[in-house]
Each structure stands twice: as C-alpha cells, then as structure tokens.
Amino acid sequence: MKKILFKLGLSCFTLLAVGGCNDSLLEKFPLDQITNETFWNTENDLAVYNTTLYNLVRNDVAVPIMMGHTDGFNSHFGSIWQQDELSDNLATREARHIFFQQIRAGKHNIPSNPDWFGYQGWNFIRAINVGLANYDKAAIPQATKDKYAAEARLFRGWFYAEKAAKYGDVPYVERELSVDSEELYAARTPRKEAMQKVLADLNFAVEKLPANWGDGNAPGRLNRWAALLVKARVCLYEGTFNKYHGAGDSKMWLEEAAKAAKELMDKGPYRLYNTGKPDSDYNAYHRILDLTGNPEVISWRKYKTGVINNHVQSYFSYTGGATKSLVEDYLCTDGLPISLSPLYKGDEKFEDVFENRDPRLRQTVLHPADTQKYNYHLGDGRSYPRLLGVPGGGYQTTTGYHIIKHYNADDMIGKAFNTGESPAITLRFAEALLTYAEAMAELGTITQADLDISINKLRDRVKMPHMKIGSIPVDPRYTKDGVSPLIVEIRRERRIELFMEGHRYNDLKRWKQGKKLEIPTM
C-alpha cells in the first residue's frame, strides 16, 4: 500500500513540477481563431500570408512600386499611365492634377502641401517584417520557406529603393516594432547604408525565388525574373544617381545593373512581342486586354468588371497630351534626329510631323487619318487634332498631340463610366534591354555587340536603322547635357520606348537633368 501511495505521489509531483517549469502545457490557444502562435504551419499558410502583401501593394498611392491603376477616389491620378505628367512628356489639362504641375514647376512646398505618393505604406513594411519573423516556424523544407521569404524581401527592397529615391535618407526598419521600440524615435538611416540593405534583399530574392510559380504568367506571384528586373532598375537608378550627383560609388551599382539585366536577357524565358507588323505591333501590344502568356510581359495587373475595375480609362484625357519636346525626340526613318535629317518635313502642316518618322510616333500620338482605326471619339464628326477652347466634343488636348498608346475604345464602349478592364504592365522585357545598354554605356565598356542585343532589338521591332557606335549623330538639341552623343541616343531610346510607363521623372532625377522641366515643352 505504501508503495502504491509513493508512486502516486511521485507521479503527481512530477506532473506539477513539469507543469510549473513549462508554461506551454498550460497555454491554450483558441481553436476557432487564427493566432500568430498557431498559424505558421504549412506552405499554404505562407502562401496565403504573402497574398496579403499583394493586396497591400495594390494601393498605388501608399505603395507606389508595382504601379497599376488605383481604383476608388484616387483613380483619377493613381495610375502608372499618369506619372509622366510629372515630367516633360505630358502637358496635363486637368485642374485636379495640380499636384503634377506643381512638382514639375518646382513649386510643391513641403510640408505645407501634402504629398500624393509614397509617404504612407509603412503598414506594408510591418506586414513584411512580421512574415519574415515567422516563416521559419512552418514544418516544411527550408527551400520552400526561403522562396516566400524571398518574395517578401523583394517587396521590402523595392519599397525602400523607392523611398530612398524620393527622400534620400530613410528610416529603415527590418523587424516588427512595438509601441516601445526605439526605432520609432531614431534618426533616418543614411541613404548609402539603406541601399546596401536594399541590395541584400534583392540579391536574396534573385537567389531564392523560383523561376516559375507554375501560373503560366498569369497576373500572379513575382518570380526570379521579376526580381532580376527590379534589381536592374534599382541598381541603374542608384548607379547613375551617384555618378551625376557625386553621391558615392557608381561603378558597383552599374555593374550590378548590367549583370542582372544580362542574366534576364540570356537565361529568362522572355522576348519582345513581335508579329512582324512594324506599323502596328508597338501600339497593339499596349492594348491587349489579357496578357496571359505574352512573351514580353514579366508582371502585370489584371482588371475585371465587377471585381477590380480599371477606372483610369475614363480619365484618359486628364493626361492632356504629349509635349512637343517628346514628339520632336522621335528619329526620322534614316536614324537621324529631326535637327539633322533631310527627311524631316517640318510641322507647318500637322500631318507632316508623322512623315518619315520612327513608326512608334504614329503608334503613340494620333494621326488625323487614324481616328477610325482607333475609334477615337467620332460621334460629332469633327476632325482632329482638337485643342482646349476649340468647339467640339471628344478629347481635347493642351498640345494637339492626342495620345493613343494605351487608349482602348473597345474597353469603354458599352460600359458604364469608371468600368474598364485594360491591364497594367508593371514589368516588361524591353526595360531590361534598355537598362543593359545604358549601364554598359555609363561604365564606358559598351560594344556594338551590346547594342545589337539590346537597343537594336527594339529598333528591329519597328524596322528602324540600327544604332552604330561608329556613327552616332550629334543632336544640337542635346549638346548642353554634358554627356556623350551615345548616351544621349540611349536615353532618347528609353524615352520613346517607355513613354507613359512611369519612368521619365525618375530618369530626369537620376541624370540630374531637372533643368529640362524649366523649358517650355508644349
């Protein structure tokens, strides 16, 4: 009997001792709720969590990195198509877009005037850091955990690169904070240090992301090729910014940009969209509603009536019109700028502007003879171009240069206002070609072979003459830019190819060419 009592007592003591030393035995989490302690178990848990990051990045005003077409109240300005209004590419006509005009004119005062883009989004960083602190809890292979961590770190690096480009020094946070965290009151992280952390995030993403998530290039998750293009973009910005602003090392950044772009070009599954129609392919590519499987598109955002609408088609006229500066940058068909080419017919007659010019001009700006082709507001029978103040309905412009790139009448006819389905291309292969050529030129190591696998691929699509290192024209319009004629021409190609895709303002910033915004361009 004593032996039985002794064993029973010992058992009770052991249970109490263990219970007293291990609080986890007493911790019980709700079975009908998701908690941080019980959530991180399977790959599906990590995939579901990272999907919330894509939901957050949809807010283009708060997180302007993977820009598409913001819906709701901000839809009239929160689109990738409208960002060129900050630059010398567009002449906005809309009073609601005064912000773009103020920025361009250098009259946007901080902090008396609120910013529209990029000062918010810190909940996005918190969500990323929470995920990174918990992915390892899942009972799945390390390589699987790493690819979701890579997805989050790609977003974090991209976010902070945008912040550094906008503000310079920036508060860099890489862990979940509480109300007592000292980082809440810390000074901003120096730009150089922050950008090293950005590069580490992007390198991790390139190394760990899968080449294919198995989605068939649906508008789904960012893959390794997307990470390479984001890295190339960020490194090109940092390299040229440092070079022209005397802000630090440029060589390393330019080498990283060229290396990332070249790897995407050599090993990625992408190529330029080309059906062999130089007079229409460029425009047609930017009007495709479903980009699934498109060979040039690396990442895109899909819109569907009744799910997520593209409101921006309804505000297309707010862009005002292309500037004369942009139109004059298109080369003639002999490969020479209008200032040097005998083929240029002048602009006394509007139609002459399009004669003997790079086919991308007529696929970007409306030729009066193409109104039927693009179904461009034909209801009142009046001709185009139309300027503000001139009688007539339809779209009116500040410049006469009506934009048809991205314009898709078929996506508006028969639909209610603010309901469209035109997608947003966020990353495309052509940018890699342009980035590679520019980085190699800035490094001073570019060869004809480099041009042939980059810039000249873009020219082949529209049957324009190749750029030749030994015969680069010296355009008198750019002799005061302080760069070589070769770099002038590579920058010109970038401006033409990526018009109205949200690059021009940042390009002018990194090149230290803000003076171009002081010149009347309409």
Segments (PLM) and residue ranges:
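Short coil/linker segments at helix-helix boundaries
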Residues: 169-191, 241-255
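Bacterial N-terminal signal peptides that target proteins for export
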Residues: 1-9
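Short coil/turn linking the two alpha-helices of tandem helical-hairpin repeats
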Residues: 164-166, 171, 213, 237-246, ...
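C-terminal motif of bacterial Sec signal peptides marking the signal peptidase cleavage site
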Residues: 18-20
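An aromatic- and glycine-enriched ligand-binding surface/loop that stacks and positions planar moieties
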Residues: 22-93, 195, 203-206, 221-391, ...
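Active/binding-pocket-proximal capping segment
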Residues: 430-436, 446-474
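Conserved, well-structured interaction surfaces
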Residues: 43-47, 51, 55-65, 88-167, ...
